[in-house]
C-alpha cells in the first residue's frame, strides 16, 4: 500500500482535484491525451483538455500516451524528487505511445509543481517520501 495515500478514494479525490485545476488553467495548451494506470492503490485516470475521467468513466477513450506507475512514484515526480527521464530509465514509470509528445508537455507543467505542494498541504499529505 502507498506510503502517501492510505486508501484509493483519497488518492482519486486528490488527483481529480489537482488535474482539474491544471486543465482549467492550461486548457487547450494540453493537446495530448494521457492514461495513467496507477498502482498501490489501483485506479486509472484519463486526462485530456476536456477534463479527467477516472476508472469506469473512461469507457473506450484512447490515449496518446499511457503511463503505468505507483501512486508514490507519481507523488515523488510532482515533488521534484524524481525526474521523468530517471523514472523511465529505472522502469519506475512505463510508457506506451509517443515519448517526444510527453517531453513537449513537461515545460507546460512547470507551474504545476508548486501547485502540487499546495494540494499536499490542503489534503494533509507529506511533502517528502
Which sequence ranges carry the predicted segments?
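Feature captures hydrophobic
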Residues: 1-129
